[in-house]
Design a protein with these regions (language model features):
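Membrane-proximal intracellular helices of multi-pass ion channels
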Residues: 1-481
Length: 481
C-alpha cells in the first residue's frame, strides 16, 4: 500500500470540499441566516486538513487498484464526516449520527432523510443537501482528476473504483480529458434543466436545488411533499425527462457530441433501459387508473415514479405507498434494476441485468445443445470472461450484504416491508421505501445501530460494494514490499 499517495489524494479532496462548503456559506450571507458560522467553521476544518495532508508531495506517485479502492472509500467517508459538521454546529440536526446519515445520503445520492420537516431548514442547509447530491453524482474523485496532475495511466484505477457499472471506458486517451468531458456534459445538462424549470415558473432557489438533485439522481428537495408541491404538469414533465437523461450512460452523449449517432443508438443497455421504463409505466398506469381521473393523468404520475425509482432519484408527485400491491411490487423491482452503467444512477445497473440474462440464456442453450459453443456479446462485441466473473461476484457480494443488513435491521423493526425496503432503497441509493420509510415518511425512527447499517449500505451501494469491503480486509493495509 502506497500510504503517501493515499494521504495526498485525501488532502486534495478536503481542499475541494472546503470550496464547496463556501457555497452554502454565501447563501447564508444572502438570506441573512444564522448558519453562516457553522459552514465557515466546517470549511476551515476541511482546509486545515487539506494543508496538513498535502504539505509534502509524495515522491512515489504510482498507485494501483488497491490504492484506488482505498482512496475512494476513505475519501467518501471523510467527505461525509466533514459535510455533517454544519448540521451539528448549527443545531439543525443536533445528533451526529443523524447528521452523518443525512450527509451520507446526500453524497451517495440516496435521498433518504431523517428529517420530519425539511421546510424548517435554512436556505444554506437546503442548498448544501442538494449540492452534496451534485458533487456525489459524478464523484468528487472524478472531479479531482481534472485539477490534480498525477501520473497519467494510473488514474484509471481511481475512476474505475468510483464510477458506477461493470467497467469504465475512456472517451479520450488521457483520463484527465475523459473526466473533463464527463463534467462538461454533467454541468451542461444541469444548467439546461435549471433554465427549463425557470421558464416554467419555478423560483430560482428551488430551480437550483431541484436541478442539482436531479443531476445527481439524489432526490433531496425543499418541500415536505417533494415535487408534488409545485402542482405543475410542465415542471413534473421536465424533471421526468431529465431524470431519464441522467440515468443514461454518459458515453452515449459523448458519441452524440462527436456525431457518432448510429453507434450511440446501438447501445443495448440504453434500449433495455428505455424499454423497461415505458413498459413498467404502462403497466402501472393501467393498474392505478381508478385512482386518477383519466389514463393520461395516471400515465403521467406512473412515468414520473418509474423514472424516479429506476434512476434512483427518489422524487415523488404522489404517495405511491398508497398504490395497489402490483404497482408497488413493480417499483420495488425497479429499485434493484437501477439505471445504466456510467450514469449517476444507482442500483445493480441495467448492463449487469442484461448480461446476467444473456448468461442464463447461454446456459439453457448449452443444456439443449451440449456441443454448441456460445459466447456472451454486448453491442456486437464479445464480453470477456473476466467481466462476467466480476458480475457474478458482485451479485453474490450484493446478496450477502443485503441479507446481513436485513437481519440486523429486523432486530429493531417489526414491520417486514419497512425492513426490506429500507435496505433495498439504501443499498440501491434510491431514497424512499415503503410503509414506515415511504415517500411521506422518514428514517428518523431507526435506532443508531440500524442507521449505522444503512449508512454502510448507502456507501457500499454507491461505491459498487468492493471499496467498502476492502476497508475490512486485513491484506489491504500491508505496505508494498
Amino acid at each position: 500500500m502506497n500510504f503517501a499517495i493515499v494521504r495526498y489524494l485525501i488532502g486534495w479532496m478536503l481542499g475541494i470540499e472546503s470550496v464547496f462548503l463556501l457555497c452554502p456559506a454565501l447563501t447564508a450571507v444572502i438570506y441573512g441566516e444564522e448558519e453562516l458560522p457553522a459552514y465557515l467553521i466546517a470549511a476551515a476544518f476541511s482546509l486545515a486538513g487539506a494543508a496538513l495532508l498535502c504539505h509534502r508531495k509524495p515522491k512515489n506517485t504510482r498507485f494501483y487498484a488497491r490504492e484506488g479502492y482505498v482512496t475512494v472509500a476513505l475519501c467518501w467517508l471523510i467527505l461525509a464526516v466533514i459535510g455533517a459538521l454544519p448540521f451539528v454546529l448549527s443545531g439543525e440536526i443536533p445528533f451526529f449520527v443523524d447528521a452523518l446519515f443525512e450527509t451520507v445520503s446526500g453524497f451517495t445520492t440516496t435521498g433518504a432523510t431523517i428529517l420530519s420537516d425539511v421546510e424548517a431548514l435554512s436556505h444554506a442547509s437546503m442548498l448544501w443537501r442538494c449540492l452534496t447530491h451534485w458533487v456525489g453524482g459524478m464523484g468528487v474523485l472524478v472531479f479531482m482528476l481534472i485539477v490534480l496532475p498525477l501520473a497519467g495511466g494510473q488514474t484509471i484505477f481511481l475512476m474505475r473504483a468510483e464510477s458506477p457499472g461493470p467497467s469504465v471506458s475512456k472517451m479520450s486517451p488521457r483520463m484527465r480529458d475523459t473526466a473533463t468531458i464527463l463534467y462538461a456534459i454533467y454541468f451542461g445538462l444541469t444548467v439546461l434543466q435549471m433554465i427549463l424549470l425557470l421558464i416554467g415558473g419555478m423560483p430560482l432557489f428551488d430551480a437550483i436545488c431541484v436541478s442539482l438533485g436531479t443531476a445527481g439522481t439524489g432526490g433531496f428537495g425543499n418541500w415536505n411533499d417533494s415535487i408534488a408541491h409545485y402542482n405543475s404538469a410542465y415542471l413534473q414533465n421536465v424533471i421526468t425527462v431529465f431524470m431519464i437523461l441522467f440515468g443514461i450512460n454518459f458515453s452515449a452523449y459523448f458519441l452524440i457530441l462527436t456525431r457518432k449517432f448510429r453507434q450511440a443508438f446501438r447501445i443495448e443497455e440504453i434500449r433495455v433501459y428505455l424499454g423497461v421504463i415505458f413498459v413498467f409505466a404502462g403497466l402501472i398506469a393501467f393498474n392505478v387508473r381508478p385512482m386518477f381521473g383519466s389514463l393520461r393523468e395516471s400515465f403521467h404520475h406512473a412515468l414520473f415514479q418509474v423514472a424516479s425509482i429506476i434512476t434512483t432519484t427518489g422524487f415523488s408527485t404522489v404517495d405511491f405507498d398508497q398504490w395497489p400491491t402490483f404497482s408497488r411490487a413493480l417499483l420495488v423491482l425497479l429499485m434493484f434494476i437501477g439505471a445504466c452503467a456510467g450514469s449517476t444512477g444507482g442500483g445493480i445497473k441495467c448492463s449487469r441485468i442484461l448480461l446476467l440474462g444473456k448468461s442464463v440464456k447461454k446456459e439453457l442453450m448449452c443444456l439443449i445443445h451440449p456441443r454448441l459453443v456460445r459466447v456472451n456479446k454486448m453491442d456486437g462485441q464479445r464480453v470477456p470472461h473476466e467481466v462476467m466473473r466480476s458480475i457474478n461476484v458482485f451479485v453474490v457480494a450484493y446478496a450477502f450484504i443485503f441479507i446481513l443488513s436485513l437481519l440486523i435491521i429486523s432486530l429493531n423493526c417489526e414491520d417486514l416491508v419497512t425492513c426490506f425496503t429500507s435496505v433495498a432503497t439504501t443499498l440501491n441509493n434510491v431514497g424512499p421505501g415503503l410503509s414506515l420509510c415511504g415517500p411521506t415518511c422518514n428514517f428518523g425512527f431507526f435506532p443508531p445501530l440500524s442507521k449505522g447499517v444503512l449508512i454502510f449500505d448507502m456507501l457500499a451501494g454507491r461505491l459498487e460494494l468492493f471499496p467498502m469491503l476492502l476497508l475490512f480486509t486485513p491484506g489491504t493495509w500491508q505496505r508494498n514490499k
